[in-house]
Amino acid sequence: MNIYFGKKIPITTCQIFDNEKKEFVKATCYEYDCQDKSDFTEIKKLDDGWTYKQETLDNMKRKFTANKNGINSEIAIFSLENKDGEILGLCNAENKKRTMEVRFLESKQDGRHKYVGQTLLASIGKEMLKNKQQKNFIIKTAIASAYDFYEKTCGFMMDSIFNCDLIMGRIGTYKFIKQTQERTQCPIIDLKV
């Protein structure tokens, strides 16, 4: 049993490419448990260049309230951070019984790092695969400019059955994780038991 005294739980370690250093650097994917209000501090400190900063804070508050009232919340908030603790990517999802549904994904828009969104999604996919009941990895509402990323880079497919934009099954998720590990020249290593 892992016990964490911080405000976030490490999920995976991985690598992303630093365009300034021209090399791969270590990164860690975290999940915020929203057990106390200190969890909001890092997100509040983000600059206003983050499109989904307020939505992330709102979802954290919803999860905090649910936790406080003893209700199991499906909201899942993930971040990808470099070794200095700088947030490079954010993802808000719903961790449902049979699906992991990504509501929005965003990476820092400074152009310094490559593979942030892909690595964050692959880390979340790896977390999803641990739940044997979850069958599909879903992008619920992708913005038009992100379709190339989700379809061509990650391998999600257009959906006509579920009420969502893009979908990937378990086999596709395994392939996507493998492809991401090859691109980033590093395994995505589980930290959460």
Predicted regions mapped to residue ranges:
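Non-catalytic substrate-recognition and accessory regions of acyl/acetyltransferase enzymes
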Residues: M1-R112, S123-I138, Y147-D148, K152-V193
